[in-house]
């Protein structure tokens, strides 16, 4: 494959509870749970006093998440929180790409027609979210004077190639997360990251890290073995890379 990926895979369920859950705000990321096959956390989003979404999320090496196990994880988590599940309202399941490395030129050789979003490789390399880049691409296309399949393809490819170059630092961090240690220890990387200043974290999610931000992320004692981190950075095609 032209791109090597990890994945943020999830199963989410919206439940009607038999009594109020007691939450006054979302629980964005509860990583105190058993890590299982990779970095795992549970996200809880209340919609009303007695309805909420519980999402079991895993940063894992392939897109396939064992659905039955994730559903049991949700039931177990609800029980631990004291939430009494009454009626399942809906379920969602998906996998977002996490870019490790790749050959963007080879990737685009497979595309004869204009494309956007995930098919164009236009997503945040660490979160997998595509909306901000979709908006930026729409702004770029709005400036075009001539609309043909060829000009659209060329413009989108140029835009995607520029984004790819700008995301090199993020891909390096992704390789440290996925390749520099055991899967069930990935939480250590995330724990250190979320201890950084709030403004830096916001710029990270926006894909707008400054040079001081990058230096701050890399400074201090690394959360993974130094040699393993260097191998992940310098040799992304090593054995542990995605197949």
List the predicted regions and their residue ranges.
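Predominantly flavin-linked oxidoreductase catalytic cores and closely associated redox partners
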Residues: 1-88, 99-105
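Surface-exposed, flexible loop/turn segments at secondary-structure boundaries
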Residues: 34, 96, 121
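Conserved aromatic-histidine-acidic binding/catalytic patches
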Residues: 62, 66, 126, 178
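Generic recognition of short, well-ordered alpha-helical interface segments
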Residues: 69, 133-136, 181, 185-188
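Amphipathic alpha-helical segments that form well-ordered structural scaffolds
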Residues: 73-77, 137, 189
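Catalytic cores of enzymes that engage adenine nucleotides and/or redox cofactors via long glycine-rich
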Residues: 91-95, 100, 118
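Conserved mid-domain beta->alpha element of the FAD-binding
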Residues: 101-172
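C-terminal helical "tail/cap" subdomain of flavin- and related membrane-associated enzymes
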Residues: 142-243
């Amino acid at each position: 494959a032209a791109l090597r990926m990890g994945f943020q895979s999830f199963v989410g369920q919206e439940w009607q509870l038999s009594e109020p859950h007691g939450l006054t705000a979302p629980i964005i990321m509860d990583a105190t749970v058993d890590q299982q096959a990779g970095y795992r956390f549970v996200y809880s989003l209340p919609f009303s006093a007695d309805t909420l979404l519980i999402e079991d999320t895993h940063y894992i090496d392939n897109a396939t998440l064992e659905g039955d196990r994730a559903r049991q994880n949700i039931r177990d988590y609800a029980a631990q929180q004291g939430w009494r599940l009454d009626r399942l309202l809906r379920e969602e399941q998906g996998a977002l790409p996490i870019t490790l490395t790749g050959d963007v030129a080879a990737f685009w050789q497979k595309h004869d027609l204009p494309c956007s979003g995930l098919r164009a490789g236009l997503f945040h390399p660490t979160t997998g979210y595509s909306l901000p880049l979709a908006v930026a691409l729409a702004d770029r296309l709005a400036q075009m004077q001539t609309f043909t399949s060829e000009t659209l393809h060329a413009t989108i490819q140029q835009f995607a190639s520029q984004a790819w170059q700008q995301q090199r630092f993020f891909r390096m961090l992704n390789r440290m997360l996925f390749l520099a240690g055991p899967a069930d220890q990935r939480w250590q990387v995330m724990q250190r990251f979320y201890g950084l200043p709030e403004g830096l974290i916001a710029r990270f999610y926006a894909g707008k890290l400054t040079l001081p931000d990058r230096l701050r992320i890399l400074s201090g004692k690394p959360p993974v073995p130094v040699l393993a981190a260097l191998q992940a950075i310098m040799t992304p095609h090593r054995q542990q890379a995605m197949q």
